[in-house]
Amino acid sequence: MFLLCVAGLPLSTIHAQKKEIIDDEAPNGIVIVTIDKAGDEIIRIMNESQLPYIHDPKAPRFLLMDKQGKFALGIGGYVRATGEYDFGGIVDDIDFVPANIPSSSKIKNQFQMDASTATIFLKLVGHTRLLGDFTVYTAGNFRGGDKTFQLRNAYMSFRNITVGYTYGGFMDLGALPSTIDFQGPNGATFYRATQLSYTYKGLKDFRFQASIEAPAVDGTTSSQFEIAQQRMPDFTASAQYSWNSSSHLRVGGIIRSMTYTSTERDKASSVTGYGVQASTTFNLGKKWQAFGQVNYGKGIGQYLNDISNLNVDIVPNPEKEGKMQALPMLGWYAGLQYNISPKVFLLSLIHISEPTRHLRI
């Protein structure tokens, strides 16, 4: 499969200039400024709140600001078009999802183009005595049904607390390689959840995070079972050590309770799932960047590329009548990126994700 990506409106990291306050007769009004004239504090918050994910838009070029320079609202996004040619009839989908590869296919060649990952966003940043540095962020693309708008992020962050809908705690955005394919690497954890999370940054070079998240459970059921309303949130925790701005090592975990109902007994039961993760990215000189991640657990298929669409969090237990079980899962990837120039790079990946081989349903 051959992939080609073209992106519009590329935005680089912004740099601070001397703070400028616009002085006129209406001190409480709103003005439009370019990002480089937003002032040191606004630029710092914009940069520090930028998530390390290649498909997230960077800071906007223009801002709406109050004339005291305390608050700024950015509106921005990008247009991204992807073209691909499939020489072997691999997957009838614009995304490369190995779990969907058929055992045989009549389609041998296929050309596709897609622009549904074009993204728009609103980002409000500022500083108050009560909230400290804060960010309110919403973003979406057009990956809903029939290319309709789909919400990707909607959250508020203040004093290291995040509330809302965004990337889950059982994943490492910084260790994801820069793939053209929007689906991302097979074997990585990737999901979004409504959550309450806290990040501790008080120890130099270390970062600790914990979150409570709304659960999402998919399972393979039969006439005997139904996936019930979930009674417990997911709990995640992680610790990360960084030795420079582009190198870190992270370990994390998740524990979850998955509720199901037996139609024969009319009774709700639950299965405990868990996951552990180790991930890293580090530079090898000025040109090379390495990426890697290993995930193992039970009942984490919902969060693991690319088996999240196979409904294998929980399945009927063939050894216990009337019971369901959480399947063991393993996923990993390793990548190496060569930066030809600041704007051009080459990437090679090896990855795998799978439920256990004893899947018996």
Indicate residue ranges for each PLM-predicted region.
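Bacterial Sec-dependent N-terminal signal peptides
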Residues: M1-K19
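Outer-membrane beta-barrel and related beta-rich outer-membrane complex signature
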Residues: F87-V91, L151, S222, T263, ...
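Single conserved hydrophobic/aromatic residue that forms the stacking wall/gate
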Residues: I350-I361
